[in-house]
Amino acid sequence: MEKLVRIEELSINSLDPNKRALIEQAKQARDSSYAPFSEFYVGCSVLHENGHIGMGSNQENASFPSGLCAERVALFESSKNLEHNKVIEIAIYAESNKYEVPKVLVPCAGCLQVISDIQVRQKSPIKVYMWDGGEVVFCASDVSQFLPFHFELNRK
């Protein structure tokens, strides 16, 4: 078995205004990040098919691992009506004064599973944009680029 990963490398300035706004809203969402332990501040924006954009940021807790990642905060908050309003894209932004932010800012395995589950529930892919604040934005057509085998429960 072989799995090929395809991630597009895009210029932030070449994106249409709506895509750029989604990505910049992920940066804005980072403003509410609470990360006193890792000092790794993450924001996520979630675009729905009706144009609504939900946002979330990582929230750490002194009782590890009780915090939540930005992607899950944004997705859980904004995915209440998936059957009528699918998630079509998410954007992730991070910054840190303590650590180097990866250029390809792949969500953690837990977040990948949540994104994958939402894709299965709504029967459509979710495009993932990843931005470190520089000139380049990375884009994956859906979460299967990072999580080729997801956990799924199917009723008998």
Set out the residue ranges of the language-model regions.
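Acidic/polar N-terminal loop/beta-strand segments that form early-domain functional surfaces
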Residues: 47-49, 58-59
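Zn2+-dependent cytidine deaminase-like catalytic core
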Residues: 55-154
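Short Pro/Gly-enriched beta-strand edge/turn motifs at strand-loop
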Residues: 24-31
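Short beta-strand scaffold segments in enzyme catalytic cores
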Residues: 39-48, 129
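Short, compositionally biased leader-like segments
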Residues: 1-24, 98
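Short Gly/Pro-enriched turn/cap motifs at secondary-structure boundaries
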Residues: 34-36
